[in-house]
Amino acid sequence: MNHSEQASAYKAVKNIVLVGRTGNGKSATGNSLIGKDVFVSEAKATGVTKTCQTYKAVTPGGSRINVIDTPGLFDLSVSAEFISKEIINCLRLAEGGLHVVVLVLSVRTRITQEEENTLSTLQVLFGNEILDYLIVLFTGGDELEANNQTLDDYFHQGCPYFLKTVLGLCDDRKVMFNNMTKDKHKKVEQVQQFLALVAKVEERNEGKPFRGKMYLEIKEETEWLKKQKKAVEASNLGEAELAKMKKELQMEHDTRMSQMEDMVKNMLKETSAAHERMVSMLNENLENAHRENIDLRKAHDHEQKKRMMIQLGLGVPGALGMIAPAALAMCSIL
């Protein structure tokens, strides 16, 4: 990449998509990145963000960012129809492609099945390449700071296997945010740390944003609609006929987008079914292992008792039970 290309890439808007479990602080993180409260953020288990929202801003360092706040895209309690619509909506808002996907986790809560599903579902929908654009952001920095702890201290307390896997897959790109801080220096510092990771993502991908098959299909469909509407407007049709043609074009476009949503919905259902099978298999294996462990322990205890009884000459009736007294008698004769 030459100097002019680097300058162009630096000035280009970077699409930053926030994903994660409802209640982890995606909206608050979006506000921290932008530098003001633009997304509604409240500590509610049901979440506040009901649909994908976007806001463009310029960081103190001059980076132009487009932050896309999402609802619980992979929330197990919502329908596949809703999720598929919002995934399509998210890709529409990321004009030019995805520069960074931020998996927002919280140090306040344990890793849930939903969060584990988020990663695998991203891979199913977009392929393993999406991991090259992944950053893991931990909220709850205020809680760690109150206990004089760092993010590394948090990991030393016991890092779940899922986290080790995620961080390994994304080259350990992680950062902690304190979305509650009033310290202006702290606010700027944590955004700079985040943008340093964004720069690493860009370097790894040679400045190219993620544009998977789904994104390209949405882009193509959107451009088709614009082109067709422009052609219709340029024609000498009457007002009523023009409105009719535009309506028909929009209906055709909506039908195609609906087909795309159905495709995403089916992929999500397949992923969900695979997760259920995997969890069921894991639970079955754990139960079998638990039963085997109990059986082994019983067998071990039985053998140990048997050996002790033999050593004491109390274990087996008959000849074996006479070994100890016979041995003592022989010793006395000798």
Swiss-Prot record:
InterPro entries: G_AIG1, GIMA/IAN/Toc, P-loop_NTPase. Mostly expressed in pollen. Also detected in lateral roots and radicles. This is Immune-associated nucleotide-binding protein 3. Residues 69-72 are annotated as: G3. Keywords: Coiled coil, GTP-binding, Nucleotide-binding. GO terms for biological process: cellular response to heat; endoplasmic reticulum unfolded protein response. Residues 178-180 are annotated as: G5. GTP binds at G20, R21, T22, G23, N24, G25, K26, S27, A28, S41, N179. One of its GO terms (molecular function) is GTP binding. It comes from Arabidopsis thaliana. Residues 272-306 form a coiled coil. One of its GO terms (cellular component) is endoplasmic reticulum. Induction: Up-regulated by brassinolides and nematode infection. Down-regulated by 2-aminoethoxyvinylglycine (AVG), high CO(2), isoxaben, and propiconazole treatments. Residues 20-27 are annotated as: G1.
